[in-house]
């Protein structure tokens, strides 16, 4: 009798374990057909890829290292960003301040929205000393320009403000000489109603 009860208990335990295994399996399995390869790019995605590559190549490959040690290249990068905003049908402006006796420029443009709140989308365009800065941060600037082109001429709920910041790398990083710090201080002084800030930083290339 005890032997039968033990055998029955074992069968019940096995059935319970099997039930929970089936629950786990059905919960974890993905429905539908598995796709092992990426979907082909659309024509718009192919064009976007080409623009991103071209902008990174322009900043890192053609202009190269851009910081106060390479001041001419820093200004060339600022001119390129300003021109890219203009070619997208936007109206860029320079937020200029002086550092080490030299004029440094944050480049901004905006798409006015129906409400006064502002969303800032930013990326720094200077590179660390000794580097052409393809990933850090030509990749972020390329994305910034792509977003500006994408939203240009389209209605927006909140104002979209695109800003390319200067002097974010050491020795200015986390100091009051950073372009973004100078810019934020100016926004506060003006009373800008900034509701969010999105930083595009080192996103790969």
Protein language model regions, located:
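Acidic/histidine-rich catalytic neighborhood of metal-dependent amide-processing enzymes
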Residues: 128-205
